[in-house]
Regions:
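Glycine-rich Rossmann-fold phosphate-binding loop(s) that bind the pyrophosphate
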Residues: 8-9, 146-149, 279
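Flexible, glycine-rich terminal cap/loop adjacent to redox cofactors
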Residues: 1-9, 14, 21, 25-35, ...
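FAD-site-proximal beta/loop scaffold in flavoenzymes
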Residues: 124-140, 227-304
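Glycine-rich flavin
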Residues: 1, 6-139, 172-176, 181-183, ...
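Short hydrophobic core segments
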Residues: 87, 102-112, 145-146, 166, ...
Length: 434
């Protein structure tokens, strides 16, 4: 098929330029700083070590730029036309980019999302979103991060390990509020060890950038008022689908109650030939979900055999602080609301040989199953690089493997993944090493 991509700013998207990729580079530097700052004695390391955030920043940009160049290479290799500019629909079969008019048979809308702000809060030099912060080479002395989701927690980890005084304020009762409650507790404990101040159940009232400092006032769930003065504020309270400003209304495409583009299982909108993927659909605002949706949309347009994605709750999720968080499916609380008999199996990394050898005993593997059928309902991991372990669980869930079948899958010893095998055993009887 003859194919073109229209992009105004970030070839490769937010992920490659100011999101997933550069943040992982910064997190890797922060992990190394954490080892020297907190675990040097454990590993027999002594002496003075300095940490240059500017060098970490430069490395993150180099990594990002390299992958973006790879995107351009792949576009050229596959004969895809690149169109630089801002595209605006004039109808469901036409887009105008500056003076250029582009017609097509099919279109995939992948316009992403935009940062949500609290009412009354305005961005400024010192009140910023993730995009400005990840493109800033200098560190503040202190920062308030508003929102304890994945982005807020990842930035908190990086900045704290480079000596920034970090306070995280979350309106809901716990950090990572969409994760299992045990996960939230474990991460809150780890962050407090880092010296990060966490205020949950707390609503930000005002954010006042006074030039040399920012004053944040807040009220907790007991009605107590407080304030904090910092160098900078990072707003990370969530995202909204980007559906305005590019003529979507001229296409007749329907929106959901959340303001997202409504799609079916094949990413089709209500308008023939118009598809949508990614954050603009608000199914699950993660890069790998957008990629998976894109594959389904492309295969559908081409008339090729495809496989729909099913329940988006079963998509893998991760937060890349250390210890990392990785999960899929239902939390324990959600499972107990939906199923009459739920089994929970949990194995701590403190009882895992590889974790002990690595000095990475924080966290656990937790499995939630249907006690009547051994069906996997959810998996929740906290620990060193556990995001790499999650695909075993999501693959098993996708192909309807039970805990009993998974318990017979031999895991390499010694590996962190043996903790998952223990949860499989625990779900059907008893664990071996606990």
């Amino acid at each position: 098929m003859k194919t073109a991509v229209i992009e105004e700013k970030w070839w490769g998207g937010v992920c490659l330029n100011v999101g997933c990729i550069p943040s992982k580079a910064l997190l890797r530097n922060a992990e190394l700083a954490h080892v020297f700052n907190h675990d040097a004695k454990t590993f027999g390391i002594s002496g003075e070590v300095s940490f240059d955030f500017g060098a970490a920043f430069d490395r993150s940009r180099k990594v990002s730029d390299g992958i973006v160049k790879g995107v351009h290479f792949l576009m050229k290799k596959n004969g895809i036309t690149e169109i630089d500019g801002y595209g605006v629909f004039t109808d469901a079969k036409t887009i105008q980019v500056d003076d250029r008019v582009i017609t097509f048979d099919n279109v995939i809308i992948d316009t992403g999302s935009q940062v949500r702000l609290l009412p009354g809060v305005e961005l400024s030099d010192n009140v910023v979103t993730y995009e400005k912060q990840i493109l800033t080479r200098e560190l503040p002395g202190s920062i308030v991060i508003v929102g304890a989701g994945a982005i807020g927690m990842e930035f908190g980890y990086v900045l704290a390990n480079y000596g920034v005084d970090v306070t995280i304020i979350e309106y809901l009762p716990r950090v990572l509020p969409n994760e299992d409650e045990d996960v939230s507790k474990e991460i809150a404990k780890a962050y407090k060890k880092l010296g990060i101040t966490i205020l949950t159940g707390t609503a930000v009232q005002t954010v006042d950038d006074q030039g040399s400092q920012v004053v944040v006032t807040y009220r907790d769930d007991k009605g107590n008022d407080g304030s904090i003065t910092v160098d900078k504020v990072l707003m990370s309270v969530g995202f909204a689908p980007r559906t305005e400003g590019y003529g979507l209304e001229t296409t007749g495409v329907a929106l959901t109650d959340r303001g997202a583009i409504a799609i079916d299982d094949h990413m089709r909108t209500n308008v023939p030939g118009v598809y949508a993927i990614g954050d603009v659909t608000a199914k699950l605002m993660l890069a790998h979900v957008a990629e998976a949706q894109g594959v389904v949309a492309a295969e559908t347009i081409a008339g090729a055999e495809t496989m729909t994605l099913g329940d988006y709750r079963n998509m893998p999720r991760a937060t890349f602080c250390q210890p990392q968080v990785a999960s899929f499916g239902l939390t324990e609380a959600q499972a107990k609301e939906e199923y009459p008999n739920v089994k929970v199996s949990k194995f701590p990394f403190s009882a895992n040989g590889k974790a002990l050898g690595m000095g990475a005993t924080a966290g656990f593997a937790k499995l939630v199953t249907n006690a009547d059928t051994d069906e996997l309902l959810g998996g929740h991991l906290v620990g060193d690089n556990v995001s790499e372990m999650l695909p075993e669980m999501t693959l098993a869930q996708k192909w309807d493997l039970t805990a009993k079948e998974l318990a017979r899958n031999v895991h390499t010893h010694p590996t962190m993944s043996e903790a998952m095998q223990e949860t499989f055993h625990g779900a059907i009887g008893h664990m071996i090493n606990l």
